[in-house]
Structures are given as structure tokens and as C-alpha cells.
Amino acid sequence: GYGLIEHSSNKSFHLDSGFIRLNEKDTLSERLFMLSRELGKIIDRLNPNCGAIEKIFYAKNAQSALSLGHARGVILLKFSERQLPIHEYQALKVKQTVVGAGRADKGQIQHMVKILLNINDTLQEDQADALAVALTHAHLWRAENNW
């Protein structure tokens, strides 16, 4: 999932969000190529000034961890190619920042993201997660830079 917000003063605004759908039947290299191509298009279209992603802390199994690692590599590469900084946050920090509780579940995250960004439409889990990371970055960057 991806999400773009704008943060000014003490308010965040939802600009865009979605997800990249990959075909599970494709080979790993084909899926990574598609991810790279589609993410590049999204970055070019939305023109963000930075990126923020969740750090991998836990995966259900080794294969999931490897797949997540490959996808993260593509994401880091696409931002690096465009000389855009990318920031990483632990899932616990994202949950604490957005919901106020480190053990928040996906439903709580979706609910708070919709409230914080004044979104009435349904959000997919991946969209809500991406927007939660964006909100975390905006909040922490603002605090760190006394803005």
C-alpha cells in the first residue's frame, strides 16, 4: 500500500492512497519488476518530498521475511534513484503515534487513520497502514524539527 499526505501547521490532509496489485502466479523477479515499475509511476505522479516505510521486525515465516525484504529493497531503490530521503519506523512506534497504543490492531489503525485524515471512504488495510506510517513521519519530523 501507499499513501500521500500533506502536513501543515497542526493538521494532516489525505492527498492520495492505494495499493499495487501483483499477480501471485508471476515469478518473484516478475513481481519485483512490476512493483518497481508501478512504484516509479506513483512517485512520478505524486511527486513526494520523501518516503516513509515500516521496518520489518516480525514475519510469520522465513519466506515471508524474504519476500518483504525484496519488496523493501525495491522501495528503497526507487526513492534513492530519485534522490528522495526515506525514513523507517518500527510498527510499535507507528501504532503508538497513530492510535496511542503499541498493541493496536489493524481495525483500530484503520479507524484512527480515517479520523485523523477525515476520510469517509473505506480504506484497505494496506492503504491504512501506509497512511499511518506517513502520519507517524509527519508527526515525528515536526517534533524533531520544532516545526
Name each model-derived stretch.
Residues 1-147:
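Phosphate- and other anionic-substrate recognition elements at nucleic-acid/protein interfaces
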